[in-house]
């Protein structure tokens, strides 16, 4: 009886330890905010250089995120967090979702998501460790998660 209770207790401890690690990975280190008030891993967005600027634009009937491809070379930049500036230049509300498409179904995937009003700008800070370890490949995809028909783009990471 004592061994059974001990075994059940030990099993519950393992399950809880795994669950807490899972929640920690799901939360990730991705932070969304304004330039003045936002921060990631203890560094203010104001102190960081913007690595890429992305814009929701309308070209005729085409609604897209521009530029379609952005390259970040980690071999030549310091190990500081990645800072993205996303701006909605369109007339309607648009979403911005960035994730690793290769393992998007995983509970551990890195994911950033924000909704932008017309003319609104937000900053997305991502720890370098999340860019390397919470992604499977070298490519992140971004798109408007509010309107699936809109054209998205890719961030290519040179590691």
Task: Name each model-derived stretch.
Residues 1-58, 131-133:
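Extracytoplasmic entry segments of secretory-pathway proteins
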Residues 25-34, 42-45, 114-159:
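Extracellular/periplasmic metallocenter environments
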Residues 45-81:
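N-terminal edge beta-strand
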Residues 52-61, 75, 100, 123-131, ...:
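Short regulatory "switch" loops immediately downstream of catalytic or recognition motifs
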Residues 66, 102-111:
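Short beta-strand and strand-turn-strand segments in soluble, beta-rich domains
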Residues 69-71, 79-81, 91-93, 111, ...:
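Extracytoplasmic
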Residues 86-90:
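Asparagine-centered strand-capping/turn motif at beta-strand->loop junctions
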């Amino acid at each position: 009886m004592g061994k059974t209770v001990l075994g059940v207790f030990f099993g519950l401890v393992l399950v809880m330890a795994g669950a807490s690690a899972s929640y920690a990975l799901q939360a990730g280190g991705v932070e969304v905010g304004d330039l003045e008030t936002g921060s990631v891993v203890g560094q203010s967005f104001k102190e960081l250089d913007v690595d890429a600027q992305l814009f929701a634009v309308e070209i005729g009937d085409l609604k897209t995120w521009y530029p379609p491809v952005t390259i970040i070379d980690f071999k030549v930049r310091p190990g500081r967090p990645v800072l993205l500036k996303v701006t909605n230049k369109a007339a309607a509300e648009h979403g911005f979702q960035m994730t690793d498409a290769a393992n998007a179904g995983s509970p551990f995937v890195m994911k950033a998501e924000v909704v932008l009003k017309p003319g609104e700008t937000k900053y997305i800070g991502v720890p370098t460790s999340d860019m390397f370890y919470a992604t499977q490949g070298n490519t992140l995809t971004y798109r408007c998660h509010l309107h699936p028909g809109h054209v998205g783009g890719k961030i290519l990471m040179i590691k």
